Amino acid sequence: AGDARVVEWDPRDPDRAFKATPVTQVTNFYACYGDEVLPNQKNGELGHGKERAAAIADVLDAHTGAQDEAVAWKALRAAAQEPNPEDITSNTQWSVVFDNTEPAAAITLRRHWGDIDAFAL
């Protein structure tokens, strides 16, 4: 809930200027060109994974007003990628949920949803 922005370099700007795009979820694509990114395919320099961002949105939309840490983990599980034997980096390597009231976070590696480590700063 609340206001959110993705700040990223514009891949089409020769000066690589920063852009701040209002979004509540994003995966491996440039949010500033989200309307040009198609799901379930590579989109050149613009990236991929729009279907996973949609999976996150579906979970968050289903829990409007009650988005706690459990909902955040549910959204991350919905968007997780299984390993691709032909591309070792094409899978969910880590997932993190940040605490928006305390300087803390919880993280898991490689979709080990039952093995979550919490950190406080």
Language-model regions: role of each:
Residues 2-121:
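C-terminal, well-structured catalytic/ligand-binding subdomain of enzymes
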